[in-house]
């Protein structure tokens, strides 16, 4: 019997609608208003730390622009038309995704410029998503500038960056900037709890707090930690599991260690995981 391969949580629960973008309420509200008022710019710049949803947001924008079955008065992509499905998978012929970290030169950008004159093959807009755009060379930015100044009507650019200060002001002045923030701890914990519920699992509150602290507001990092913990978990995630995975000491063990130090006792009295974490 064929068994479907395991899909990591970050991919399994990647947002498919704007309403699923966790902790980015201001961003979602602004994007909704721009679509509803038909004031969608030709270039977006998504700025935020790693793992907060920049790539997911870029694909949502691409889907909203090219969805063929959106309901009247709604900005949410249908996720059922061929455009939505292929964009979600990163396979749409008219949505070109490029890694600015590996393609930094002027020739890479010139390849894009040479193709913008051609209309989309199967969608309304041809969309270029450039991740880590701050890694482009100065000559590459200069080559891109002319197209951003006078873009074809059928072309949209979506840039993503973790380092806004490295992007030239001439580029920043020609894009609509959106800032994605790191998630508040309570919001992230609630999100993790919901995912565990859908997976038929549960977790100690302290375990989720530990994951949230380690992830520091990054959804992707939190789900990556959760994936690793689930390898050794049957039904309920305990904080001890998380601490052992991360090589950390729990609060109770920290207090116990302080007591041992005060009393001048040997480390032989503490657990092996704790001893490994502090030595």
Residue ranges and their predicted role:
Residues 1-177:
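P-loop/Walker A NTP-binding region and its immediately flanking N-terminal helices
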Residues 89-93, 111, 124, 160, ...:
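Extended, largely alpha-helical regulatory/partner-binding modules appended to the mid-to-C-terminal parts
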